[in-house]
């Protein structure tokens, strides 16, 4: 495997880039908790390897999950140095957020309205994220163990800039011979 353009082979990023996986999910959990007003332990990531037990029907809570990463079509290559260049692109992160329990409307609408508060967006910006758009809050009650559980869902699209560094060397000199007259 090559990690520089001075040798043949595949190039992988030499920097990690932004948060993904559990780190990103932890950041999103703190964000949803902080903006909605739900306690930290009541906001849970969906689709984890270890599933949390379901909340009691009379308890309020929220599950969220990242449904898609959507990138812009054309990345830009910037900051070329002798040793590397940076790939810049913008990425959208589409999240499904579900509020459960007897006060799910209250927490869902508090979260929805909190998305418009500039201080909340500034705090989210510390993690390189911003709210791009959100859907309406939609009722989707679930029948679990022959009991209706109140549930309201919304989709949030976050946006961020992704920067990755690659070992693409700059061309400093190239030996050239001209033939002819």
Where do the protein language model's features map onto the residues?
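Small/polar-rich, solvent-exposed N-terminal microdomains that initiate assembly or binding
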Residues: 1-81, 172, 176-181
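Short, conserved charged micro-motifs
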Residues: 23, 104-109
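Aromatic/basic-lined ligand-recognition segments
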Residues: 54-56, 137-139, 164-168
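Short beta-strand/turn micro-motifs at beta-sheet edges
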Residues: 80-86, 143-144
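Acidic-leaning, charged glycine-interspersed low-complexity segments
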Residues: 106, 116-163
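A short secondary-structure junction signal
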Residues: 107-110, 167-169
């Amino acid at each position: 495997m090559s990690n520089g353009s001075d040798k043949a082979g595949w190039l992988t990023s030499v920097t990690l880039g932004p948060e993904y996986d559990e780190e990103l999910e932890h950041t999103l959990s703190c964000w949803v908790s902080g903006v909605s007003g739900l306690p930290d332990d009541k906001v849970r990531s969906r689709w984890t390897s270890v599933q949390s037990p379901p909340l009691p029907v009379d308890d309020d809570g929220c599950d969220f999950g990242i449904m898609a990463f959507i990138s812009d079509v054309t990345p830009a290559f910037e900051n070329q140095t002798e040793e590397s260049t940076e790939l810049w692109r913008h990425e959208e992160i589409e999240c499904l957020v579900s509020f459960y329990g007897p006060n799910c409307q209250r927490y869902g609408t508090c979260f929805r309205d909190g998305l418009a508060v500039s201080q909340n967006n500034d705090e989210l910006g510390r993690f390189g994220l911003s709210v791009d758009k959100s859907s309406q809050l939609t009722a989707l009650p679930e029948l679990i163990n022959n009991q209706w559980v109140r549930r309201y869902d919304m989709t949030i699209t976050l946006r961020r800039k992704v920067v990755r560094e690659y070992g693409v060397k700059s061309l400093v000199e190239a030996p050239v011979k001209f033939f002819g007259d």
